[in-house]
């Protein structure tokens, strides 16, 4: 399954819950999705709090999936082709230099 198919699947899920409806309690606005994305990303940090290794890979995978799904939905509602944006960003990153020494 590719990014577009995953996005379509996510949109079907959101539609089935009524979250695209006008009076929903979970409006799929860029603001709300950005907040949700950030909150889910923060949950990933919990897996590394006070340790360097993953102790529950299945739980981490679930949190990563949450982040990915919110990212797909945010790109969808803002009309951004996420696959294209990611490929463009990879090309930009190939030309960048990073200082690998810690300061």
Q: Can you describe what each PLM-predicted range is?
A:
Residues 1-64, 68-103:
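Flexible "arm" and connector segments at domain edges
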């Amino acid at each position: 399954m590719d990014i577009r198919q995953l996005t379509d699947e996510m949109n079907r899920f959101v539609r089935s819950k009524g979250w695209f409806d006008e009076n929903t309690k979970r409006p799929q606005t860029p603001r709300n999705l950005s907040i949700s994305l950030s909150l889910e990303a923060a949950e990933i940090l919990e897996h590394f709090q006070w340790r360097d290794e993953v102790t529950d890979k299945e739980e981490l995978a679930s949190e990563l999936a949450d982040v990915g799904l919110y990212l797909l939905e945010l790109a969808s509602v803002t009309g951004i082709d996420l696959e294209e944006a990611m490929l463009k960003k990879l090309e930009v990153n190939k030309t960048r230099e990073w200082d690998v020494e810690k300061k």
